[in-house]
Amino acid sequence: MPPKDIRLSMLKRSTLLPLIRACAAEVVGTYLLVIFGIGAVASAVLTGAQSGLWQVAVVWGFGITIAIYVTAAVSGAHLNPAVSLTFAIFRHREFPYTRLLPYWTSQLTGAVLAGLTVLWLYGPFITRFEAENGLVRGASGSQRSAMVFGEYFPNPGLFGTGPDAQSLISPFGAAIVEAFGTAIMLLVIFALVDRRNASLPNKYLSPFFIGFTVAVLISLFSPLTQAGWNPARDFGPRLVAYFAGWGSIAIPGPSGGFWAYIVGPLVGGPIGAAVYEFLVRPGLGDRIPVGSQSADDEDNPPTIPLS
């Protein structure tokens, strides 16, 4: 038998390697989610190729679905700090708090990389858009180009950037909208990953329904806040915009309200999960759909069950 210190070293390596792989998957998955999403926003804002909120929302939804299918079997496909926090609170045996920081870092990394990619690909189109519309990057009004990366309230593409528009919704109001949308999203996710829910569709369809839910939420609330529901999705590309010349228009934003896209989802996610855990799940009893795994395995799923 190897010495104790060698056994401990082997144990550390055996537990560290799966975490490294999970974090790598979170980087890839978040990158895919954000590149699809802000790519659609860039296409709509800069070229008019996507006409209407629903078209952009559908691309976001499919981006989420694809990212989940790609990464769920490795990392659980959180792809969102609000999702990770919520699972750490309510499924801590499967997703302990010690994983939060590595997951959050990975998600932010993927989002930053996606933002850099869009800046690289669409850079000339952004410059042309600003010139055609008389926008000075980093000055008041340049939210109309910065919205490709971060999010603003109300939606600059619909309401403009003047004082009248800014008076429609406050930073606190934006945080409430973000919390509300994220709560609904997590409520749906918790219902879809709970195989004691006899009304579940085939487990392999769960990513599709999650993506569809997000698409619907975006179509409903994007006029208000651009519908983030994901701190990494907003803050990662927003950092890119900050260093690419938008400065204070990106952070802290024209109303100083960039925090709404971080605090809102982190508060709303656990609220949505709590609604499911304490109001819906107790009514399920011990009913387990035919074809599911055992109750012991399903009591605390880490997230999207695809394997």
Predicted features and spans:
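Membrane-interface helix-loop junctions and terminal tails of multi-pass membrane proteins
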Residues: 1-307
